[in-house]
């Protein structure tokens, strides 16, 4: 059964409005991720001051929860490139790759689990699994990529994994996950209301 022409027109306008809202919001969250790196950066472990905490994953995780894991991955890649040529330019392509692997694995896993179970348990479980997966990915990445780009012996990297690298990634991702879990529902209500307003 075909819809009346005027209804079809409204349906197209509604879809375009939702798409515009989605793209705009993802863009804003991606930009916010970059800004947060400029504003908040500090080392967690004195023995490894080059490993800095930043809250940049928070807006990207929000994008993944609100619009799906593909949106989170897209936001991750864009934010990583921008950060890699601005605030983190000293780390170059190495920093961009490591950022994409760390945040990308986190938001992909968390976003996929939350998409399958869109409630508080799904959000909590997705973030928890994402933290663990991201830490594992970064442990492997440090063993393979760090020696290639930084000229650090593999044995030296191995010695840093358990006391520094793995705890750092667990702590950083865990902090960001707790914040996302605390703020996502109020923010998601705003997303829903904004979309509903565009229907009227």
What are these regions (language model features)?
Residues 1-200:
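Loop-helix junctions at membrane interfaces
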């Amino acid at each position: 059964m075909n819809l009346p022409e005027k209804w079809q027109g409204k349906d197209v306008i509604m879809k375009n409005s939702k798409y515009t809202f989605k793209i705009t919001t993802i863009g804003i969250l991606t930009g916010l991720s970059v800004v947060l790196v400029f504003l908040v950066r500090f080392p967690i472990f004195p023995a490894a001051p080059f490993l800095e905490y930043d809250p940049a994953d928070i807006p990207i995780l929000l994008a993944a929860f609100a619009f799906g894991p593909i949106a989170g991955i897209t936001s991750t890649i864009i934010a990583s490139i921008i950060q890699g040529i601005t605030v983190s330019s000293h780390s170059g392509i190495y920093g961009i790759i490591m950022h994409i692997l760390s945040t990308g694995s986190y938001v992909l896993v968390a976003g996929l689990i939350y998409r399958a179970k869109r409630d508080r348990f799904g959000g909590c479980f997705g973030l928890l699994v994402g933290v663990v997966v991201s830490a594992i990915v970064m442990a492997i990445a440090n063993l393979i990529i760090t020696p290639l780009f930084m000229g650090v012996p593999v044995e030296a990297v191995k010695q840093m994994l358990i006391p520094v690298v793995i705890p750092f990634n667990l702590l950083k991702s865990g902090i960001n996950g707790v914040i996302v879990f605390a703020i996502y529902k109020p923010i998601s209500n705003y997303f829903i209301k904004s979309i509903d307003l565009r229907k009227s």
